[in-house]
Amino acid sequence: MTRAVALTGRLTFRPGQVPGIAGERPQLAERLLRGRPGEAAPHLLPRLFALCGEAHGVTAALAVNAALGRVAAPEPALFRRLAHETACEHIRRIWLDWPLHLASGPVPSTFNSRVPQRELIDCPMLKASHSESAAMLAWLERAVLGTAPRRWLAHWHEDPAGCLSTWATKIHTWPAMAMRQCMQVAQAMASMPAPLLPHASTDALRELAQSLAGEADFPCRPSWQGRVFETGSWTRLGLADCSAFGNMWLRLGARIAELVLLSLRDGMQASGEAHDSPCLQMGALALAPGQALAWSEMARGLLMHWVRLVDTPQGPVIGGYRIIAPTEWNFHPDGAVAHMLAHLAPFDAADVRRSIGILVAAYDPCVPYTVEFAESLGDTVHA
């Protein structure tokens, strides 16, 4: 085992087998933070979870403040930080991962492979000096949508499936082409989402917090109300109907739609326009004295932090710290991806790999994985 795998963990995908997933990620937060002052959590965790460091830092700050009795509505700046990181992560995954996981078959002769690279480099949102929202919306229109962002998003809200089909078949940007190439297979991968929404209810949050506090291995194998749920950009608390995303095609589309929405909201804030509420929710709940649970909706789904502070002569220090990240729900051995993997018919290794690529693009495990076929195929693939 390499040092990197020891830190991040590794998943094994087992198509056509039960369970469809094996392996887990190490729970490092408590080992890193135990005995440190509470204020250490929002400073150290972003270094441990670099890809989504902002989300972990924001959520840790909310949890520690609530445990110290400082419960208040999150400041607007926290929502802006979370939204910016989420949009950037969507862009990176679409440009860096989708070429590996979604593209298949012949590439059109008119396609220049250097164009996506230039577009990623030119993306205003990814620049350290990003401040011009109009430039980001213009980039979205040119590099992603092929039409005005507001027009595309209005079509999406009216008819998600129709919007994606029209866009993927008529527009020649790199993301549209990638979606076009996986369209038939992704649409056939039907699965009604079971959305993880405990942050809709204080009672549900308390129930989850009780499990987190009482079961050391709960973050590795979380469940709620006896079930394993899924989380992603298609299960946001602010969405009217999560059941509209009934296949992998629409779940992939939800990431595009959220990128567009976050970019438009960024533009509205820059111009002083009002809007009803943040796209992404966050909050904290004080529990027993010195304990709190905080949550945030980040790029891969719902992130939860639980903290327990203990008093010492030098002041409160961390006595317990547990995190449930979206990966633990989505790639649970009894979760959504595992069920899809178990039902894949492993007769053609190439077809199975393509289906796995679509699942990985939609749910994004954020850790290395291995594909382990049944003995009849005699093949193991590393990714």
Swiss-Prot record:
Disulfide bonds: none annotated. It comes from the Bacteria. The keyword Manganese does not apply. InterPro entries: NiFe-Hase_large, NiFe/NiFeSe_hydrgnase_LSU. Keywords: Plasmid. Coiled coil: none annotated. PANTHER family: HYDROGENASE EXPRESSION_FORMATION PROTEIN HUPK, HYDROGENASE-2 LARGE CHAIN. This is Hydrogenase expression/formation protein HoxV. It comes from Cupriavidus necator (strain ATCC 17699 / DSM 428 / KCTC 22496 / NCIMB 10442 / H16 / Stanier 337). The gene is hoxV.
